[in-house]
Structures are given as C-alpha cells and as structure tokens.
C-alpha cells in the first residue's frame, strides 16, 4: 500500500484514497478492497499541478492585498512566487500529458474539447453537488454563490462549443456573412466576409485580426 493510491469496493463501488500509510488492508462490505491505481506517478503529478495552480492564484491575491496596504516589495515577492508556481504547474502538466498521451499539449481543437468537457462537468455535476452540500449545512449564501457560478460555466461551455465548431469548420478568419474585423494591435476595423491577411495600418498579419462582435 502506498500513499495516494485509490482502492475500490467491488461490492458497493465505494472508492477511497489512501491519505495516510497504516498497517493492514482496507475492507468494505466485508470484502478486501482492490487497488485501482495503476500509475501513481500520474496521480502525484496531477496533485502537484493542482497544488501549484492554487498557490499561484492565492499568491496573486496576496500580492494585490499587499499592494493595497502599501507594501510594494512584499507584493513583488508574492507575484514573483506566483509566476514561479505557474511554471511549476506547467512542467507538471506537460510531464503528465507526455506520460499519458505521448505529447506535451493537444492542439487548439483538442484543448477546446477538453475545456468543453470540463465546463460541462462543472455546470451539470460539480457546482450543483457543491451547492447542495452548502445548502444542507445551512450556508445559504455560499450555496447561492456556487449555484450562480455553475450557471456561468454553462456560458463558458457554450462559448467553447461555438469556438470549436467555427475552428473545425475552417471559419476562424472567414464568415458566411459580412462582419466587422478588428486589428488587435492598432484597432483598425475592416468590414467584409473575411479578415484581412495584413492590417493596412500597422502591418500585423492575419492572426491579429478577429471578429469585433466577439469582443462585446
């Protein structure tokens, strides 16, 4: 038995993660539980990724607080550490992806699908469940907040679905109807069925041209 391994009861389906090492074996429903962890390295990589990601966010919040309180040097230290944690998280996610998918990251279409799946889980399962937990324990305001965040995730899912559909159809820079396209660098606006290959003002290429209505 190793810390962070997961064990499953083959009778009721209960799954537990071993958080502390101890003697003996795990039992449920009168039966010995089966270890279902086949790749502990992947498990600890994702735990490290989650921990570093949370630390990065916390340190950025702490930096803003220090800034507001007039402690600029402390704010800079918090922000520098946050940037370090971001890189740590990136390295851990890349290592996980290489172990499991033989590549560091997916392409944009694959990443959009990953985002769709994540947002769908959050709005259909995670936030409704978490909202209920808070409500059952008498935390009405927290329950409401979690439920409302879940509704935002629906919009995120819809946004990613639209972007993936457009990308997969080869219409990221073309449209069936006339639209306004804006240069991200200088703000030049062009109206037409496709974005300009080169901005006539600042000469930035196609990838800097995007639909103006998507910015509203």
Where do the language-model regions lie?
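Non-heme di-metal
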Residues: 15, 19-21, 38-216
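Generic amphipathic, hydrophobic interface segment in small proteins and small subunits
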Residues: 26-38
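Short, cysteine/histidine-rich loop/knuckle motifs that typically chelate Zn2+
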Residues: 10-11, 27-30, 185, 201
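Small, basic N-terminal interaction modules of short regulatory proteins
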Residues: 1-13
């Amino acid at each position: 038995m190793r810390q962070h391994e997961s064990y499953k009861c083959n009778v009721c389906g209960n799954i537990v993660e071993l958080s502390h090492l101890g003697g003996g074996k795990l039992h449920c429903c009168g039966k010995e539980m089966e270890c279902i962890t086949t790749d502990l390295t992947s498990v600890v990589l994702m735990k490290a990724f989650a921990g570093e990601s949370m630390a990065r966010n916390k340190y950025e919040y702490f930096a803003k607080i220090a800034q507001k309180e007039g402690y600029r040097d402390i704010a800079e230290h918090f922000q520098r550490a946050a940037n370090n944690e971001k890189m740590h998280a990136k390295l851990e996610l890349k290592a996980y992806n290489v172990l499991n998918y033989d590549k560091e990251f997916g392409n944009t279409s694959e990443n959009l699908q990953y985002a769709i799946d994540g947002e769908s889980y959050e709005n259909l399962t995670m936030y409704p469940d978490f909202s209920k937990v808070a409500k059952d324990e008498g935390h009405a305001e927290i329950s409401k907040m979690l439920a409302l965040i879940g509704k935002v995730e629906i919009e995120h899912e819809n946004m990613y679905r639209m972007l993936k559909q457009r990308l997969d159809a080869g219409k990221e820079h073309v449209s069936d109807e006339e639209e306004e396209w804006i240069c991200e660098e200088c703000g030049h606006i062009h109206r037409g069925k496709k974005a300009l290959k080169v901005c006539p003002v600042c000469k930035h290429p196609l990838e800097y041209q995007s639909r103006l209505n998507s910015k509203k």
